[in-house]
Amino acid sequence: MPELWDLYNIDRRPLNRTIQRGEALPEGTYHLAVGIAVFNTKGDILLTQRAQVKSQYPGCWEIPGGCAQAGETSLEAACRELGEETGIVVQPGELVPLLRELLSGAHLDMFAVTKDVPLSQLALQPGKTTAAQWLPFGEWLGRVGDGLYLTPSWHKEPDVPLYPRLQQYRDGKRDYIL
């Protein structure tokens, strides 16, 4: 069954149209994308390795995330994507919204959650994720953009507004104005 995405305008208003994943977005339209930063209580961040068969960034390390399917909110998509890619089940109320960012073709919503899950208990998604690691947050920040470690918004350079939010979340802040 093909994956459908809802389309939005630049102001995030629904256009009441869908597009099939893989099709070119019509000019001036956007879809919803999500990223989920998972921290453990030691402050390490969970990274997953993209499968070698992925067309974009094969073998790179990233935080879990993906695209909202038609009819999903970004919060629902974040819960689904985290479960699909790692086997970590979260309820919407567990996710803390960190920020919204406008990317080329996507409205990206970033969330964070704290979960102590041993790597041996993760259920990686075949064809999408091949490995996982807990990395100290500072070490990850130092490696972001090195060609092997991706930023959450899929830019090669660190995303300036996001990193302070991740650090604040890691340090205990839980209230953000989006």
What residue spans do the PLM features occupy?
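A structure-centric signal for secondary-structure junctions around beta-strands
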Residues: 2-4, 33, 42, 57-58, ...
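Nudix hydrolase/Nudix homology domain
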Residues: 22, 59, 70, 97-178
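The catalytic Nudix box helix
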Residues: 46-47, 63-96
